[in-house]
Amino acid sequence: MKQIESAKNQKVKDWKKLHTKKERTKTNTFLIEGEHLVEEALKSPGIVKEILVKDETRIPSDLETGIQCYMLSEDAFSAVTETETPQQIAAVCHMPEEKLATARKVLLIDAVQDPGNLGTMIRTADAAGLDAVVLGDGTADAFNGKTLRSAQGSHFHIPVVRRNLPSYVDELKAEGVKVYGTALQNGAPYQEIPQSESFALIVGNEGAGVDAALLEKTDLNLYVPLYGQAESLNVAVAAAILVYHLRG
């Protein structure tokens, strides 16, 4: 194991850069923090590149060959991590391969900008047993630190890929997958829609909703009725209600 004392060490500087999308894209790697996320990443062979700890006892046993471990001083570890009260362990991971096999139950996300909302929806899609999460233009970075923390390891369980949504919707429909949008106008209460063996659900931007051009391509648009005085539901909450209803 290598030890690093200084927060000015070049490795520390390189790891810190992974908080930026530019560096994540350049290196095809990302940083995770906390014991749970590291445990989930280690369940996927070939994902973890480096493990960073403050305490040697935090190093997981039975590591894959080739994973480099570093023990960092308090200052060096704090310089790398993003959370205010960081845990004792972090890891640098390779980006998962963007594989999108034949998907029969899919969540499509159009221009959702809040990383916390995105992470929650990835976690929901994983919990509901969907086949993939597909991100369109304008959607937050899936490997932003807040997105990763909100998803709680679901990035390692379900494909999260970027696609041109209009083109992908056309592909799904050609394969016989029913595509649902989310909109009040020309929409139906979700309770009226039967469960389905295959479906794609599109959820949209927190303020503007799903792009009008996408809504024109859907088979049907759904909404969650509001019975109180709230103007709307959080997009991640609405997505959870609809996904669980559609999948049955």
Swiss-Prot record:
Name of the top EC class for this enzyme: transferase
Pfam families, sorted: MRM3-like_sub_bind, SpoU_methylase
SMART domains linked: SpoU_sub_bind
InterPro entries reported in the protein's UniProt record: Alpha/beta_knot_MTases, MRM3-like_sub_bind, Ribosomal_eL30-like_sf, rRNA_Methyltransferase, SpoU_MeTrfase, SpoU_subst-bd, tRNA_m1G_MTases_N
Keywords from the UniProt entry: Cytoplasm, Methyltransferase, rRNA processing, S-adenosyl-L-methionine, Transferase
Keyword Ribosomal protein: no
Disruption phenotype: Mutant strain lacks G2553 methylation in 23S rRNA. Loss of the gene does not affect growth nor lead to ribosome assembly intermediates accumulation.
Keyword rRNA processing: yes
Annotated localization: Cytoplasm
Primary role: Specifically methylates the ribose of guanosine 2553 (G2553) in 23S rRNA. When the target G2553 is mutated, is able to methylate the ribose of adenosine, but it cannot methylate cytidine nor uridine. Modifies free 23S rRNA but not the fully assembled ribosome nor the 50S subunit, suggesting that the modification occurs early during ribosome biogenesis.
Protein name: 23S rRNA (guanosine(2553)-2'-O)-methyltransferase RlmP
Organism: Bacillus subtilis (strain 168)
Phylogenetic placement of the source organism: Bacteria, Bacillati, Bacillota, Bacilli, Bacillales
